[in-house]
Regions:
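C-terminal substrate-binding/active-site "lid" region of AdoMet-derived donor-dependent transferases
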Residues: 142-207
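Conserved SAM-binding loop of SAM-dependent methyltransferases across substrates and taxa
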Residues: 77-89
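Conserved SAM-binding motif I beta-strand of class I
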Residues: 90-95
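S-adenosyl-L-methionine
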Residues: 25-68, 98-131
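Conserved class I S-adenosyl-L-methionine
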Residues: 67-76
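Bacterial N-terminal signal peptides
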Residues: 9-22
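A short SAM/SAH-binding and catalytic strip from SAM-dependent methyltransferases
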Residues: 130-146
């Protein structure tokens, strides 16, 4: 509005000033009455980091190598992304938390893997996963199930690994129990390979 007043002040015709003030007033009213921008939704889970030795086991089970493209859905501080990039893979992390995204980007930079790793603040349920052939998860079971429609579109042979939580209605190819040397706790890692194997009597729909 200030810039409008400055421009109009230079006009020699008083009517021009009146018209400009009127237009500025309408614009200000429209801006004030416009609905507020929609805020990003809250993260789906409370962030709990995966112990580093569990991360290593997840990537080992997924057979991650430099030819792979790894997507970490709900990447937290980026430790899985960094570990995958250190194996030479292209690694991309997604998270809804601005704080976690900034932390993950800082960890990518700290570990000097910027050429292979990227972090994005995005809703994982809106993503096109077709570029990836390895997906890593540490989400709740109902969220794993909600991802099924997206996971089923992955290329054949793509691997999915989940820390601690299964995917109801889908049979894992492998399940490993381990005790972390980092936290002393027992952890379970699930591995699935695309095409996903539906368990008898179950038809996962991706609905909660």
């Amino acid at each position: 509005v200030t810039s409008v007043f400055r421009a109009v002040a230079m006009l020699p015709v008083a009517v021009g000033l009146v018209l400009a003030v009127s237009a500025a007033g309408r614009a200000a009213f429209q801006e004030a009455s416009a609905p507020p921008a929609k805020a990003a939704r809250a993260p789906d889970v409370v962030y709990v980091p995966t112990p580093h030795d569990v991360v290593d086991k997840m990537l080992e089970m997924a057979r991650v190598k430099k030819e792979d493209v790894v997507y970490d859905l709900g990447c937290g501080d980026g430790r899985i992304v960094v570990a995958a990039a250190k194996k030479g893979a292209k690694a991309i992390g997604y998270d809804l938390s601005r704080e976690r995204v900034e932390e993950a980007r800082a960890n990518v930079k700290k570990n000097k893997v910027e050429k292979l790793a990227e972090i994005f603040e995005k809703d994982i349920f809106t993503l096109d996963l077709s570029e990836a052939n390895v997906i890593t998860l540490y989400l709740l079971p109902k969220l794993n199930v909600k991802l099924i429609p997206q996971l089923e579109k992955l290329k054949p042979g793509s691997r999915i690994v989940s820390h601690d939580f299964d995917m109801k209605g889908v049979q894992p190819d492998r399940m490993v129990h381990m005790t972390s040397q980092e936290d002393g706790e027992s952890h379970t890692i699930y591995l699935w390979t695309v095409p996903l194997k539906k368990e008898p009597g179950h038809e996962p729909t991706g609905q909660q």
